[in-house]
Amino acid sequence: MHNHHNGLKTAALFGVLWAVLLGLGAVIGSSMRSTTPIWIMALVGVGTTAYGYWNSDKLALRSMQAYPVTEEQAPQLYQIVRELSAKANQPMPRIYVSPTPAPNAFATGRNPQNAAVCCTEGILRLLSLRELRGVLGHELMHVYNRDILTSSVAAAVAGVITSVGQMLLIFGGGDRRNSNPLAVMAMALLAPLAAVVIQSAISRTREYDADEDGSALTGDPLALASALRKIHQGVQMVPLPPDQKLVNTSHLMIANPFRAGGVTRMFATHPPMQDRITRLELMAGGPAS
């Protein structure tokens, strides 16, 4: 459903991310005169990716202390999700609410048959039903475009690269016969940096696509634009604490859940909010009067 250019861009970024992982293994293997680290890097990457893929929903929901809600508890939420799921001819996801006052939402799960959508109590209080429908359209398109799989794989591979880089910095390559210690240390510093930049770029690309596809599903891009404006303001007033579990989940959320700081655009998991709003307004033919 999503933009063909963005699909190619995501595939290319994934290729570079895996190349960084294997390159890290190659540098270690070359310096230690062994190819074993290359295979270890590949196997760890595959194993971590598989774990992240199968458990992405549990990990994300647990990090936000989310609880399932019934249709009796949240009838309007169910009504919107059921309508949009039927319109997309897709199964109904499980619905959760997180008890945080910070306004946000995310979707998780390895495929549409095992998906969950979570809204915070803060976003349910903040948005109108029209705006909430725009947000849920965005989140459902993350599921239908398999973005949860994409982001989980990217996060897992980047996490492996970062962990290996940290170990190399601590142990210094480990082998006194190391023929090229400078190359190992340089890779230990640069590979995690590159991995985070690539993972962030993948995440930003998927956000743009979910905005576009979600607005096509709801037929109301201005509703999402209005919701994003409110969410951005709300997050600045009630940000999430920078807990590591929340940091690991933040790329799934519709907006960066932390207070704006000095992070450059290269490392941001979400596009600039004004860019997203402007794109949505262009989809609608201009801002609301």
From Swiss-Prot:
Pfam families: Peptidase_M48. Zn(2+) binds at residues 138, 142, 207. Keywords: Cell membrane, Hydrolase, Membrane, Metal-binding, Metalloprotease, Protease, Transmembrane, Transmembrane helix, Zinc. The keyword Transmembrane applies. It comes from the Bacteria. Its EC number is 3.4.24.-. Belongs to the peptidase M48B family. This is Protease HtpX homolog. It comes from Arthrobacter sp. (strain FB24).
